[in-house]
Amino acid sequence: MSIFRTASTLALATALALAAGPAFSYSINNSRQIVDDSGKVVQLKGVNVFGFETGNHVMHGLWARNWKDMIVQMQGLGFNAVRLPFCPATLRSDTMPASIDYSRNADLQGLTSLQILDKVIAEFNARGMYVLLDHHTPDCAGISELWYTGSYTEAQWLADLRFVANRYKNVPYVLGLDLKNEPHGAATWGTGNAATDWNKAAERGSAAVLAVAPKWLIAVEGITDNPVCSTNGGIFWGGNLQPLACTPLNIPANRLLLAPHVYGPDVFVQSYFNDSNFPNNMPAIWERHFGQFAGTHALLLGEFGGKYGEGDARDKTWQDALVKYLRSKGINQGFYWSWNPNSGDTGGILRDDWTSVRQDKMTLLRTLWGTAGNTTPTPTPTPTPTPTPTPTPTPTPTPGTSTFSTKVIVDNSWNGGYCNRVQVTNTGTASGTWSIAVPVTGTVNNAWNATWSQSGSTLRASGVDFNRTLAAGATAEFGFCAAS
């Protein structure tokens, strides 16, 4: 599209400025793991953060919270990766966002949607959080069956993929692109029909992206029913990879990431959810739809989720069984749907106040990640005791202490106000609960990730649920805006 080829010098400079040193390279090793260019295995503890793919053209929730506040909270909960959906109109240089409370997000005032996308990606990158971009909808409204529609051509799709790849290829923590969200309906695989074969379109899309961003990963989803090489029925959009067994993808194996989607009864009640053997019937279904390829390809779920007990009662059972199955396949990562609470059929990690956390969902995800805590070890036999000399008593060590230092970072300033972030670090030798005071100018009118009060030129702040207690050496962060 011509609008992308006439991007202003300023926009290009902004894109290049996102890079913090040379870009990382991501690939798939022989053990089907994602690794960076140092050979370090990358585990994606991910969540979907949506909004840029909608008519708002910006991440949702900014009517209720500060955007950096949410990113800090994500990271504090243990997420280290996001899948970030977008739509073509968001990429246009003249598209403006909607539904932002600028009193909470003053640094976004006057920015286009693309400029905000740049800032959001740059913030994730600065925090060492991985980003998988996702071409989600062609019209910023509904999910299309194919990669093109009557008003959005394949040529436009390929141009958009190239544009995104070129813009973010040098941002170290952007690891790749999900070529098309949830092919379904008319989409086929391996039939020889060029108009509908998603596998061939994915190969063309991959070639377009890798020609521009050769260090990226390419995420490819499945389809739904297929006339060949597929047992059909009961498949969620993007969830059927069965035809891959008959028609492999001509995409470099060290760049290919299979990323099917799967959901439970909160999204749609498939017949197998009513089976008398549910949920014990599910592993065989998952194995058929996508799991059979976990032994030959890098595979994770690009979307999965649900209300987890606050909708259809079976959904919690389903999600628990899914995580158990994934762990059995050696899959300990993926992108949960969603961070946002305003996903009607799944809810989110956040509740409707855009702040409170579904701790039960986090417990589920930590089980998937393998960070839920150690299980009780199997007892070992008690050995026959042998006499030992009485040891010399050792002095009781002095308990550790916690002390806290602060670092104030200026985020934005303008005539009449400013926004700062404050990093609080436990410089002591034991964990502790932080409460600090920092000098301020003017009147604080908004703060996030802290309980706060102002007395004169002093801002007093203490942690909230997810960041209140810091281990020795750990850092929390909160922010505030003030009228000066």
Swiss-Prot record:
GO terms for biological process: cellulose catabolic process. Residues 1-25 form the signal peptide. It catalyses: Endohydrolysis of (1->4)-beta-D-glucosidic linkages in cellulose, lichenin and cereal beta-D-glucans. GO terms for molecular function: cellulase activity; polysaccharide binding. The active site is at E182 (proton donor), E303 (nucleophile). SMART domains: CBD_II. Its EC number is 3.2.1.4. Residues 370-402 are annotated as: Disordered. Keywords: Carbohydrate metabolism, Cellulose degradation, Glycosidase, Hydrolase, Polysaccharide degradation, Repeat, Signal. Residues 378-398 have a biased composition (Pro residues). Transmembrane segments: none annotated. Residues 375-399 are annotated as: Thr-Pro repeats ('hinge') (Pro-Thr box). Coiled coil: none annotated. Residues 395-484 form the CBM2 domain. The C-terminal region of the protein is not crucial for activity. Belongs to the glycosyl hydrolase 5 (cellulase A) family. This is Major extracellular endoglucanase. It comes from Xanthomonas campestris pv. campestris (strain ATCC 33913 / DSM 3586 / NCPPB 528 / LMG 568 / P 25).
